[in-house]
Amino acid sequence: IRYCCHDPIFLKNRKGEILLLFAKFLDTEVNFTTWCNGRDELWMRKTQDNGRTWLPAVPAGIQSGHASNDSVLLPDGTIVFASTSTELPEYYFGAVQIYRSHDDGESWEKGALLTADDGNRIREPAICLRPDGRLLLFTRTCPGTAGWGTAGNRSLPSYRAESLDGGLTCC
């Protein structure tokens, strides 16, 4: 069986291995009519030779949302990435969950869970590591009632969050 996969991101661990994290629809090859309805989960593949060969895909052990942009590797070896979250029914695909790995991507712990207080939904986060050690996170937004956005929406604010502790908390 083939599966429809989407939203891939690359992660690099302290051993130099490259991980490919992606969302995989579990019940159909092509799922355009039911896009992003919670029936997908995050899977991962790993290469130890800079992409020449890849180990088989395995579940990443993360049951929430879609990653959208690449990760950061902290000086202590912790991998951090942010994902659009499906955990909160009132913010379904409208919140951001930060994930952290201390064992080169073998397992993940949850960090901060972010929402907007003004009724907008935040999604598709991008995260970067500043030279001073701060993590900055930027998100796309859309109105809380618009799903993934609607024609005619001209411009909404882009939200920004900052973490001083590697993504455990954000402000």
Task: Please report, for each region that a protein language model flagged, where it lies by residue.
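Asp-box/BNR beta-propeller blade signature and adjacent active/binding-site loops
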Residues: 1-171
